[in-house]
Design a protein with these regions (language model features):
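All-alpha prenyltransferase/terpene-synthase fold signal
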Residues: 1-219
């Protein structure tokens, strides 16, 4: 599902990005028509994988249905697709709201689905929602910082990239926002102390999202 969203996001009619993670984008190699079809095919493949690969003896069907509904919500007309629309529309929408929809929804869904599969309590699900949303937006803010620095160095290739934190607030304010989101995400994990070391990867992912490819000290 995430791969499908990235393929579509890179299209000329969207962010118009010829590369992704240092490699040519899907449409750059195979053409726009094939990239659209690839994204369209990957979305349902994700749902099929969930249904076919989740052990029925370990995960109740009711939990599985909640996972499918959650993912569908996060990528649909009130989630990621809404964020992309607002980004393309270019209206007065706040950059924070756009980033929450484009990136926060998927981060939230990823965290919540893990909770559903594990049988988490309702209050834990809400903490996971807030954690995942914070990490998703954090990832986007750091991406904006990296992209801005690449542009300064003569790189960066997202021609139609919409609003970003760095364009609206500048790099220093964007870094402050990233620090705020990192703290918020970790704060939500404070309610999971009873799980001990099993929650450590969630803390590590927050630091990874914050630290990758840039140093706060040289901002």
């Amino acid at each position: 599902v995430h791969a499908a969203s990235l393929i579509h996001d890179d299209l000329p009619c969207m962010d118009d990005s010829p590369s992704r993670r240092g490699q040519p984008s899907n449409h750059t190699i195979y053409g726009v028509d094939m990239a659209i079809l690839a994204g369209d095919a990957l979305f349902p493949l994700g749902f099929r994988h969930i249904v076919s690969q989740t052990p029925s003896d370990l995960v109740p069907e009711s939990h599985l249905l909640r996972v499918i509904a959650e993912i569908a919500r996060s990528v649909g007309s009130t989630g990621m697709a809404a964020g992309q629309f607002l980004d393309l529309e270019g209206g007065p929408n706040a950059v924070g709201f756009i980033q929450e929809k484009k990136f926060g929804e998927m981060g939230e869904s990823s965290a919540v689905c893990g909770g559903f599969l594990a049988g988490a309590e309702d209050d834990e699900i809400e903490r996971l929602r807030r954690y995942g949303r914070a990490v998703g937006v954090l990832y986007a803010v750091v991406d904006d910082i990296i992209e801005e620095r690449l542009k300064v160095e003569g790189g960066g290739d997202r021609k139609n990239k919409g609003k970003s934190y760095t364009e609206v607030y500048g790099v220093e304010k964007a870094i402050e926002k990233a620090e705020e989101l990192r703290a918020k995400a970790k704060e939500e994990l404070d309610g999971f102390e009873k799980y001990g070391e099993r929650v450590f990867p969630l803390y590590s992912f927050v630091d990874f999202a914050f630290d990758r490819s840039f140093s706060v000290d040289d901002a």
